[in-house]
């Protein structure tokens, strides 16, 4: 993901998040540090989703996963998360974490397929409505079973949903 993708990513965020990151903040996240990794998914030559990972010590923090409403349900989120997981393995990370709205059952289900498990709650985390965030972790990133689980989730998704042209 690079400078050329920023406007498409910003447009997706504005469609799916109540309080999206600003273009400037997003640019800083994408281009700012060697400890931040962002990927995009494309279908039909257009950006339809993106995801970000921040590395802190030996852990990865999934900072965002967003899919255009017109592409939701096609397995794009699964493919994006899988790419972040692969990156975490290649960086020799040992764990990954994320926050998800407590009410976002589709996302929670996806994260569970990858081995993320609830470990706590951040009360009132989302400022738009005071909703709690569920904190989820996966601690076996360095174990070969982790990437096997990721690839199995991707294979199932491709078989049932298709997915984007590429991530």
Regions found by a protein language model. Give the residues of each.
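Conserved GNAT acetyl-CoA-binding A-motif
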Residues: 88-99, 110, 122
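Conserved active-site tyrosine of GNAT-family acetyltransferases
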Residues: 111, 116, 136
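Acetyl-CoA-dependent GNAT
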Residues: 3-74, 78-91, 139-143, 149-167
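Conserved catalytic-core motifs of GNAT/GCN5-like acyltransferases
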Residues: 97-99, 117-134, 146-147
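Short glycine/proline-centered loop/turn elements that form peptide/ligand docking sites
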Residues: 81, 104-107, 124-129
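Residue-level recognition of the GNAT/N-acetyltransferase active site
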Residues: 68, 72, 101-103, 128
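Conserved beta-strand edge residues that scaffold enzyme active sites
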Residues: 23, 27, 102, 125-126
């Amino acid at each position: 993901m690079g400078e050329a993708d920023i406007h498409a990513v910003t447009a997706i965020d504005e469609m799916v998040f109540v309080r999206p990151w600003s273009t400037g903040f997003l640019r800083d996240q994408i281009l700012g540090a060697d400890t931040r990794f962002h990927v995009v998914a494309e279908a039909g030559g257009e950006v339809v989703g993106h995801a970000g990972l921040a590395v802190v010590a030996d852990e990865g923090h999934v900072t965002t996963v967003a899919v255009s409403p017109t592409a939701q349900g096609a397995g794009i989120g699964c493919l994006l998360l899988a790419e972040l997981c692969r990156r975490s393995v290649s960086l020799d990370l040992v764990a990954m974490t994320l926050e998800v709205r407590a009410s976002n059952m589709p996302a929670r289900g996806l994260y569970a397929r990858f081995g993320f498990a609830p470990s706590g709650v951040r009360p009132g985390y989302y400022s738009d409505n005071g909703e709690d965030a569920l904190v989820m972790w996966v601690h076996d990133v360095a174990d070969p079973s982790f990437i096997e689980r990721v690839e199995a989730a991707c294979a199932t998704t491709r078989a049932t949903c298709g997915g984007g042209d590429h991530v």
